[in-house]
Amino acid sequence: METRPSSSSSLSPATNLNLDRLKVLKLLGKGATGTVFLVHDSVSDSSVSSPFALKLVDKSSASSLRRARWEIQILRRLSDDTNPNPFLPKLLASSESSEFIAWALPYCSGGDLNVLRQRQNDGVFSSSVIKFYLAEIVCALDHLHTMGIAYRDLKPENILLQESGHVTLTDFDLSCSLNKPTRPEFYHLSDPEPDPNPESNLSHNKKSLRIFRQKKKKTKSARVNPITRRRLSFSGGERSNSFVGTDEYISPEVIRGDGHDFAVDWWALGVLTYEMMYGETPFKGRNKKETFRNVLVKEPEFAGKPSDLTDLIRRLLVKDPTKRFGFWRGAAEIKEHAFFKGVRWELLTEVLRPPFIPLRDDGDLTGKVTEESGFGIKEYFEKLKTPPLPLPHECSENNPFVDF
C-alpha cells in the first residue's frame, strides 16, 4: 500500500486536499489536460506564507483522467524515494471529487526555461549557463532512469526554476515505467573524439547559423508513417511503442515505430541543448510531416567553430539509439564528456551558484492577502461553464440577426 509523502508545507499529506478551502492567487498555466493555479489554504494558511501550485484536471475527459492518475502515481514514487533528487518535484497532497482530480506541488516562482531563454540577449544562453542547467537536468534524468522511469517529455516548458534558482522537471503524464536494460559496462562509440577547439562565441550563434543554412542544400525526402508500429525484440530490456512527445523533440525511433526506451530522453536532451545554444530546435519544419522527415534524415547544423558543446549535441543526436550517447552506460557517459569537465556532480546544489535567481513574486503575496482576496477553485470553473451574456444591439430593420 502506498503512503503519502511527508512535507514541510502547511498541507497535511495524510489527508486529501479540501478544494473548498483553497483560494486561487493566480492562474499559472492551462494546457490540454489540466489547469495549474497558485493557491493557498484559506484556513491553515490565511497569511499566505506557504502558497503552492495546484494542478487540477476535469474528470469529464477519460484520457485526461487516466493521465492525471498516472502522473500522481509517478509523483508518489518520487516522493516516497528514500534518496529524493533535488531536481525532481515532491507531491504535497492530492484529492479527487466527482468532478475533479487535483494534486499539490511546491511552487516554482522562476517560471520555465523557455521564458528565461527568450529574455536573454539574442534569445540564447551562454556556454556556462547551459552547462549549469544541463548538469542538473542530467542528474534528474539519471535518477528517473535508475527508478525505471522514462520521462519522454523533456522540453524547456517542462523545466521549472525553483525559488533557489535550481531546476525542477514537471509534467509526468507522458512518462512510462520500463525495466532497465542490461548492457555492457563499457562500450566504445564510433563517434568522433571531442574537438579540442575552444568554444565559439555563443552570442553570435543565431546569426551564424542563419548564414550557414543559406548555403545548405535541401534535405532528401523520407517516408514518414508514424501510424505504423513494429515491436522489436531487445534482450535484457523493455521498450515502449506508444507515440508520445512534442513534435520537435520526438526521436527517430518513435517516429519509425520501432519501440523505444530511455534513449529517447537523451535524444531530447540533445534537442534541448541545441535550442539553448541557438534559440531554435534543429529539425523544425514547416509542418509536422517535414519536421518528422528532418528528424529521420537531416543532420543538425552547427555554426561557428566546433567545440565540446557541439560535440556533445552531435553525440546525443545520433539517429541510431544503440549508438547514441547515454544508451549503454546511461548518464555516466554524459557526465564524463569534456563539456562537463570540472563539474562536481555530487555537490551541484552546494557548490555552483545558479546563474539566475528569481525575483520575488510580482504581488509579494506573503502577508498582503486579505480575507476577500482570491477566488475559489469551483467558482473559477463555474464561471467557465456559464455562457457569456449576449452583446447589446440596436433593433433595426437593417439588422437581420436581431431576435424579437
Curated annotation (Swiss-Prot):
Function: Regulates planar ovule integument development by suppressing aberrantly oriented growth. Maintains planar growth of integuments by repressing the developmental regulator and transcription factor KAN4 which is involved in the control of early integument growth and polarity. Restricts growth in stamen filaments, petals, and cotyledons.
Subcellular location: Cytoplasm; Nucleus
PROSITE patterns listed in its UniProt record: PROTEIN_KINASE_ATP, PROTEIN_KINASE_DOM, PROTEIN_KINASE_ST
Annotated positions binding ATP: 28-36, 55
UniProtKB keywords: ATP-binding, Cytoplasm, Kinase, Nucleotide-binding, Nucleus, Serine/threonine-protein kinase, Transferase
Effect of residue 165 to S: In ucn-1; loss of activity
CDD domains in alphabetical order: STKc_phototropin_like
SUPFAM superfamilies in the record: Protein kinase-like (PK-like)
Organism: Arabidopsis thaliana
Domain Protein kinase: 22-340
Catalytic reaction annotation: L-seryl-[protein] + ATP = O-phospho-L-seryl-[protein] + ADP + H(+); L-threonyl-[protein] + ATP = O-phospho-L-threonyl-[protein] + ADP + H(+)
The keyword ATP-binding is assigned to this record: yes
Family: Belongs to the protein kinase superfamily. AGC Ser/Thr protein kinase family.
Keyword Transport: no
GO BP: integument development; negative regulation of cell division; protein trans-autophosphorylation
Positions of region (Disordered): 185-207
Protein name: Serine/threonine-protein kinase UCN
EC number: 2.7.11.1
